[in-house]
């Protein structure tokens, strides 16, 4: 197995197309501004259409409802040109994962109908459930671009349905698909690769259906690029791709020039590894020097035995997401150009750059701590562009059951409260910034699953950290188990270490998961697996976000509104803000 985790990486884009950079740039300079505007916006629209096609065509609730998927367009060398705004965690890694594929099989060897596929955490990928598929786009016999998608697959085998919190290594987490080239007509579409995948998963209808959704989304991207090439010509299309990346680079470099040079440090920690109570610290040193920014994770804790390890691609993605959210405006497209001024480094064998075969299924938890550590560092230099610590955890809940008709696997990523910010309160009960999944409607779970029912879902008062701008509220989601032998597996965080406040703001609430059984309450660990019985009531209580600024500076009208809406109880308002009912 190829080990792609590296001690450091320079995140730069390669040349675009077979023309030299100078030739493409010359065409870009001569490109009509109106044509450029139309083509560049069309590229972004195509990526979004691909994302919509993927979500609407999928079979599993984790993609169809939660939208745990992404789509992007690439130039011929695998540089991201445009990407759908679905999962930020996928933003930075898709080009790195693509390049792992072309290292195994150069794109010159591809034929129409071929595709690359990869989910190997030690071959450029993230965790096994995120499967990346890249399809070449041929025009006039030449590859001019690629369409790429990634979907989180509901089940890819492994030791437990949905997720395996006690996996000893990456092999126990599911089927590994190394960076490879296949033919759709020969190897998929009823061929040997499709049959191999179907034979290794518990819910083949949903899993194979989601693979077909990825191929369908890639086909949409291919068709739309062919239309653009036919209308504007290949040279203009390639030039617009190049200029779109250059535009993002110019805008980001300008933003960096406005920030004082220096080294800024931040750290955060995962609660524990599920085996002991030692917190898992992630440290980030952010260096800004002119038009460049570097992040070094030296000093972060060693890799662990459980699945909390964060592979290199995930660390890079979390870092890029933090930088983009704090230092750029939303109108700057994310693409390879944005990445050019950035470097990321992390020592081998650490939590954020583990060695094979460390398990990585829950890599989102340390990835969030990378995100938080970078934002804490940047808070020292751009305090008006960051938010306090939020729920910032993947509350992954997998409830499965094996019945006479096979497995039923429910997987959901539940949200919590955002941290308060410099201008407003944190958002209530939403997924965290890196993940950005939507909730699964109760009606959808009622239709899809017969081994449980959702019997409660709502906001948790008094969970947002106090501050001038309070943290967002956490949520509760309550399940009634209907059948004996249901399997519950989870990984979550913020159970021991609360979301931090910034600039005098208070911490948010803790997370907890409980089972009510026969009149008693069983408290689960943050990383756990248990067998459930009919009649059990399982409840997640997610954490609220930290507050921003001192609570004494909160406007009285906002406090009164919080009390009126039930977001903050009168007792908590009196204790935390000095509020009285007659104010």
Name every feature range the model reports, one short phrase each.
Residues 2, 7-10:
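Low-complexity, intrinsically disordered or signal/transmembrane-proximal segments
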Residues 3-4, 15-112, 117-139, 143-582:
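Glycine/proline-enriched, intrinsically flexible loops and inter-domain linkers
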